[in-house]
Amino acid sequence: MLQPSKKIYQKLQKQYSRRINLDLKRIKKVLEKLNNPEEQLENVINIIGSDGKNSVLTSLKYFLEANNQKVNTFTSPHLYDVRQRFWLGNRFISLKEIKKYKKIIERTRLKLTLFELLTCIYILSAAKTDSESYNLVESGLLFKKDRTNLWTNPL
């Protein structure tokens, strides 16, 4: 079981805006400066809607895993620990990885919201996993302008 990582999340909340901004320009610019890691992710399934997204994502995850498929997931919000948002194959992301990817993203010197930062952390971490993994990505707000709507051909 994960131990709470409130300290790191509280620090992120202070450092990054939590306001909603329905614009994909910033996150796309950051990803471009990082050589478009989102393009390395295959089998992306965007889960959208107003209710039940996490239930659908969890059901799909268990179905795929029961069929010996590798699965990465990105969800929000987390219930207990920020690492719960990031499932990579068979484990949650580590705090060390979160810090590592945060530093990489900060080197772009572009200002992001907290959700944009977390989305970029997911993309960078998932891009390092098996290329045949399924990537189940829960949308945050509105699909068309949502930070998770970055792939040209999601499943």
Where are these regions (language model features)?
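Charged, amphipathic alpha-helical linker segments immediately N-terminal to NTP-binding catalytic cores
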Residues: 1-20
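ATP-dependent carboxylate-amine ligase catalytic core
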Residues: 18, 24, 31-32, 37-40, ...
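Hydrophobic positions on the alpha1 helix immediately C-terminal to the Walker A/P-loop
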Residues: 56-59
